[in-house]
Amino acid sequence: MNFFNAEHYRAVKKFVCKLDGARILDIGFGNGVTIKKLSKNINAKFYGVDISADMVEKAKRENRDGVNTNKVILQQGKAEELPYNDDFFDTVYTVNTIYFWEDTAKVLDEVRRVLKDGGNFICTFYTKGYLDKLPYCDSGFDKFTPQQVRSMARERGFHDVKVKILSDCKAYCLVGTKIEGE
């Protein structure tokens, strides 16, 4: 986690801090600092999947204590093919990864599949308007407005979808719930 993700981390922490005994998945954990911070303060089991083998190794080193006690389980994999059983997680979160997914609809379907009924999906992201102003975001980023992210989550079956502003209309946090039978 870097300075730019600090606000995103606080948003995720707000939603997972009361999940005592839960199973929580981080999609695209990068260097693993967010998992480390959350796992130190929350009595839950943390799982993570990241496409980069280098990041998996770095995050395992960063989370050595949690990995050694089996509180943190990290593995390489794609968000479009989550390597977990159906209805396994109480919460799934992702911080600034939506831009890099090959197939956003497939990832959202996978998140719904691995979430338990009543489980929440938390997705923090910077808006298209903000990213368009950054020179290093010219290519390799799928950029979305908050309305687009909300619509995609609803289309893929999430309920009670809310998008909250994190900072100056440039960063947002989406929260959606999996409800079966509706």
Mark where each language-model region is.
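Class I SAM-dependent methyltransferase SAM/SAH-binding core
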Residues: 25-81
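A short SAM/SAH-binding and catalytic strip from SAM-dependent methyltransferases
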Residues: 91-103
